[in-house]
């Protein structure tokens, strides 16, 4: 991340994508090329990706749809943890089984229609479970990624108290 010159509070995020799927004939046929790629970030390990298997991709690596849902889930997590820390809610465990629904059009395009986050949060014994639940709404309102999409991102949190 870098600050955007001349724009207060603006940040640039850079990724370099390299396609590794030329099997010798480029994209001369739909079935004749691989879908693997690498995403490179300065100072970080490469991320290997491919298309979803339904689009002839490799099921053993990440696809853009997986990463898209994960970006919404992880942004919510980080927003939520910050709010909890500031509100003196001690989170001791957090898991999310997020699911995104993408619908394809007859012309081959498509879009995500919804993503549902299902965070299971454990707070320290004696913590305010109602407040912990309410902070999910605020986390959603402050999540940069959720604020950038044009479809509903629902949140169905479960709050438990630790021992």
Q: What kind of feature is each model-predicted range?
A:
Residues 1-70, 81-163:
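Extended beta-strand/beta-hairpin segments
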